A protein has these predicted regions:
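Hydrophobic transmembrane alpha-helices of multi-pass small-molecule transport proteins
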Residues: 51, 56, 107, 113-117, ...
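Membrane-interface helix-cap regions at the ends of transmembrane helices
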Residues: 2-7, 52-70, 114, 118, ...
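Loop-to-transmembrane-helix transition segments
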Residues: 12-20, 47, 54-88, 105, ...
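Glycine-/small-residue-enriched transmembrane alpha-helix faces in small-molecule transporters
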Residues: 1-42, 150-186, 193, 221-241, ...
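Membrane-interface helix caps of multi-pass small-molecule transporters
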Residues: 30-33, 37, 91, 95, ...
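Structural motif at transmembrane-helix junctions in multi-pass transporters
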Residues: 37-43, 88-104, 180-187, 234-256
Length: 302
């Protein structure tokens, strides 16, 4: 019985985030293919949010009695953090320098233990802090490019990406702290439903209406949205049910590694090849991959 319990815990804390990371890599490939149809990221994000809302509804089967109305502000705050983080991240990636924004977004991993401490959830073991810092540096190395941008765009990217990373980190921490009060099953679908309603703020950013999306673009767009939804279910369920948000985020950070591997292996066939892989970039990304695996090993074996 103890062995079964340990296997379930390992699956929840490590397996689900790893599955989410791999699913994210698949969605990244389809996102690149979708971008080829000229669909801006705001419409893509709205579609992904709607599909994610649907994917979270089966959690109602695990729900018990709903809490008092006085607690319904909690999923609203978490939903707001999700949408704010999404807007800031997409703004940084679309309007700023990707070579700056992508590595800075990796700071989410180290923001998580900081917010846990600030919100009174207690201090994490030293090994977890070291793993979070190592994974953060690894993500930055994995996102290395030789691109150079102007100073103004660099500062803009730095501020928006860091703010987006902080919002998503606080989102994860609040899911862990507040979902137990709701019996977990109810909190997740309510929160995602609220975030989808809040996603209507994206409408002003649409360059064209949703109905103008080409019919031939829907297979890749719907596939990307489905994978995004499934990876969200996996990582959020891990945080909500097993309450190891710092560990889950370190494992989930491998999504960048799987994305790079997927682009390298399959990008040519899906029209999503990476032209930035110079010898210097390859060396730094390899170092990042090794550091990331070392950070995960620290969590598992120490």
């Amino acid at each position: 019985m103890q062995l079964l319990s340990n296997l379930v815990t390992i699956t929840g804390v490590l397996g689900l985030p790893l599955l989410a990371a791999i699913l994210f890599a698949g969605s990244a490939l389809l996102m690149k293919r979708t971008a080829g149809w000229g669909i801006e990221i705001w419409r893509v994000s709205f579609v992904c949010n709607v599909v994610s809302m649907v994917a979270f509804q089966p959690f109602w089967f695990l729900a018990g009695d709903l809490p008092a109305w006085s607690l319904w502000w909690q999923p609203l705050v978490v939903a707001l953090l999700y949408v704010v983080g999404q807007v800031l991240t997409l703004t940084s990636l679309s309007q700023g320098e990707i070579s700056v924004a992508a590595p800075v977004l990796g700071l989410k991993i180290v923001f998580v233990p900081i917010f846990l401490w600030l919100l009174g959830a207690g201090l994490l073991p030293v090994s977890t802090w070291v793993a979070c810092l190592g994974a953060t540096l690894a993500v930055m190395l994995l996102n290395t490019t030789d691109a150079v941008g102007d100073r103004g765009r660099v500062v803009f990217s730095l501020v928006t990406a860091m703010s987006g990373a902080a919002a998503f980190a606080l989102f994860d921490v609040c899911v862990q702290l507040w979902s137990p009060t709701w019996g977990r099953g109810a909190f997740l679908p309510v929160m995602m439903g609220m975030s989808t309603l809040l996603s209507f703020v994206l409408f002003p950013f649409f360059k064209q209406p949703l109905r103008s999306i080409p019919r031939d673009a829907w297979p890749s767009l719907s596939g990307a949205a489905a994978l995004i939804a499934l990876q969200a279910v996996a990582i959020v369920a891990s945080v909500a049910f097993w309450e190891q948000v710092a560990v889950s985020n370190v494992v989930y950070s491998t999504r960048g590694l799987w994305s790079l591997a997927a682009v390298w292996l399959l990008g040519r066939y899906l029209g999503a090849s990476d032209s930035s892989l110079t010898p210097r970039v390859l060396l730094l990304r390899t170092a990042g991959a090794l550091l990331l695996f070392g950070s995960i090993a620290l969590l598992v074996f120490v």
